[in-house]
A protein has these predicted regions:
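Conserved, helical-rich catalytic subdomain that frames metal- and/or nucleotide-binding sites
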Residues: 172-175, 179
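Conserved NTP-binding/hydrolysis module of P-loop NTPases
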Residues: 168-170
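Short strand-turn-strand beta-turns centered on an Asx-Gly dipeptide
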Residues: 62, 219-220
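Short, exposed beta-strand-loop hairpins at the edges of beta-sheets
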Residues: 225-226
Length: 241
């Protein structure tokens, strides 16, 4: 049976949604237009979305970078939004989601492997050869068995790090050269080859905000910055199955 009251409610709901969508699209268009006009060199905008604060919008650029603006882009805010009730850094939470790395998305062709035991468990590691914490981490990892380590050379500590990483990548036995240097302080032998993989690692890390070494990525996507010990690695490996 036709119900005028219910039909009217549905019509109002649809109309309200339509008006909201139009307003949202108008805000999106206004922000994009004004930022482009006022900042000709402004990066291409990936997405404009609402924030929990009325009238404030998130503008995402370069894949993972976030700024905030009002609906007309008259004011721009760089920094974090904090939810004081929940005690949560909303910007940090959002950035974590944007920079999450699925293991399947890792460019494994740009890594070399160190296999221990049956190699069934998987860990990706981004390390700089001049990183003291990385050397400590490598020593600890000798206690972790039955795992394959995908080693990404990630020289972010200066020109010498780049030179060493390039030489390590060009070594005949990358895994041996790496462990000789990191564990036994054996000098890296100069070598030459196509080192584009090392440069790609740096670009990949910048994109996903890998800001320090070592950084670990487990098979389930868990990302851990810092030189955690073998016990902590084993615990994460057990839960990442």
């Amino acid at each position: 049976m036709f119900n005028l009251k219910n039909s009217a409610k549905r019509l109002l709901a649809i109309s309200a949604f339509g008006m909201f969508s139009v307003v949202a699209l108008a805000d999106d268009a206004s922000i994009r237009k004004n930022l482009k006009e006022r900042f000709p060199n402004f990066p291409a905008i990936d997405e404009v979305s609402k924030t929990p604060i009325p009238g404030i919008f998130e503008v995402r650029v370069n894949g993972t970078e976030i700024i905030y603006t009002d609906a007309d882009a008259n004011h721009m805010i760089q920094g974090s939004i904090l939810d004081t009730k929940a005690r949560v850094n909303l910007t940090e939470e959002r950035t974590t989601k944007l920079t999450a790395i699925a293991f399947s998305a890792l460019p494994l062709k740009d890594a070399f492997t160190i296999v221990r035991g049956n190699g069934k468990r998987k860990i990706a590691v981004f390390e700089d050869p001049n990183c003291g914490y990385c050397k400590r981490f490598e020593a600890n990892m000798q206690k972790v068995d039955n795992a394959t380590f995908y080693m990404f050379l990630y020289p972010i500590l200066g020109a010498d790090s780049v030179a060493k990483s390039n030489n390590l990548w060009c070594a005949k036995d990358k895994a041996k050269a790496w462990q000789d240097y990191m564990l036994r302080d054996v000098a890296v032998t100069p070598a030459s080859c196509d080192t584009a993989a090392v440069a790609r690692n740096v670009e990949f890390g910048k994109k996903y905000k890998i800001n320090g070494t070592p950084t670990l990525i487990f098979a389930d996507g868990t990302r851990v910055p810092g030189a955690i010990d073998a016990g902590q690695v084993e615990k994460i490996l057990a839960s990442a199955k």
